[in-house]
């Protein structure tokens, strides 16, 4: 069957500052990573790329089932040359329709890459190929996790072995020869065997591993591709966040929202019997992670109330119960990442607040004759009564967090922050490769003032293309921090008067010790 399809290997090379001359896209109701708008005379055209081609492999890494932003990232990280294995559009659609194993196409027998004739690890009765790191949560049974740790001569790192059949580790998704990347959110790739053993022992009766399987690990080592923790699969975790969709009734949604004391964030309380909240599956003590697709983990009470109000007569909450919250905290992962790959019952995909563009040019920005003085910005923010006044967003699979919805007249606006600014440093620490939740934590722990080194989109692309490190010395000195007395909310279009005004179905009660709002 596979012999009727002939994938093509296209080797593209470009000059520094030049682009490859094509767009890499995902399109609605169309499968695969599509090649579009191949420019005449470009490296892409010279290499044989054609409009409608589907990309199967990048530098011999199979990418057909990977998330689009990861595929884009692989091309960008290839520098000035990249090898693409592509299949023309008609052949691709026929191959998908006849269920041809696309991974086998174009494989040369002499290659010693991933073995396509060997069954992938079997999980829950089906064949599962792991192409990304995965989180595995283990809770001891009978004083044992059901695995051992080993080191391999000539190889860096610690690996899983002696997996007990039907034991805790096996049930959690651990495979023999898995490479251990993290223990409870801490990277252990450079740790010794003894250090890793000690970390597992100190973890007590539960532990969270970030693992990658043997074949994928080998391939990433050969291709010198670094794993990004934010691309980890969450599918094996036993507890997951819940998306609760509600329509407002005559008496509101039927629950109270309270600021947590021991538990950070906003907590669901006092759900009315028969209310929209109860019928939708909301539970007492649920922690609110996101409102209508927007993270609220860093927001204060009134800001979250305002975001729910903005939804009108319906709202969507991403919530976690205490057990799920504790599990994600152990992994040092934000439950908000669940949004970014979650498939909903109707088949649609719940995207992150900053959705992947449908059209992405895979290139370094072309040189222009126009001279632009590209500079990063050093912005000093003094927290207002209710926050800094901006959203912090991230896209799964891409480095960096970026600014969205800067509130006019707020601390962020007055300090010079703008929508789409990429955060480079927080208080002098480079956070470009740090995951979203860690950047949030750095800003939260800054107290009443924070200094951000940011870069506008065009300037960021320019520095990346020229391979110029973005450092604070390139920026102009910051202005004096703005007056912190203004009541502006972090990550919310907030009116401090409206948040405390009683609506027909919403009441807000605030004191120095607690905040409690009926929804």
From Swiss-Prot:
Keyword set includes NADP: no
Ranges of compositional bias, category Basic and acidic residues: 482-504
GO biological process: positive regulation of protein targeting to membrane; protein localization to plasma membrane; regulation of monoatomic anion transport
Alphabetical UniProt keywords: Cell membrane, Membrane, Phosphoprotein, Repeat
Predominant location category: membrane
Entry's localization field: Membrane; Cell membrane
Tagged with keyword Cell division: no
Biased segments, Polar residues type: 357-367
Region ranges (Disordered): 347-374, 473-519
Domain of life: Eukaryota
A cellular component term, taken from the record's GO annotations: plasma membrane
SUPFAM superfamilies in alphabetical order: PDZ domain-like
Modified residues (Phosphothreonine): 451
Segments of skewed composition (Low complexity): 505-519
GO molecular function: protein-membrane adaptor activity; signaling receptor binding
Pfam annotation, one family: PDZ
Every PDZ domain range: 9-90, 134-215, 243-323, 378-458
Note on domains (UniProt): The PDZ 2 and 3 domains seem to be involved in the interaction with SLC26A3. Interaction with the C-terminus of CFTR could be mediated through independent binding of PDZ 1, 3 and 4 domains.
UniProt subunit comment: Interacts with PDZK1IP1 and ABCC2. Binds to the C-terminal region of SLC26A3. Interacts (via PDZ domains 1 and 3) with SCARB1 (C-terminal domain). Forms a heterodimeric complex with NHERF1. Interacts with AKAP2, BCR, CFTR, SLCO1A1, SLC22A12, SLC22A4, SLC22A5, NHERF2 and SLC17A1. Component of a complex, composed of PDZK1, SYNGAP1, KLHL17 and NMDA receptors. Interacts (via PDZ1 domain) directly with KLHL17; the interaction is important for integrity of actin cytoskeleton structures in neurons. Interacts (via C-terminal PDZ domain) with SLC26A6 (via C-terminal domain).
The family this protein is said to belong to: Belongs to the NHER family.
Identification of the protein by name: Na(+)/H(+) exchange regulatory cofactor NHE-RF3
Species: Pongo abelii
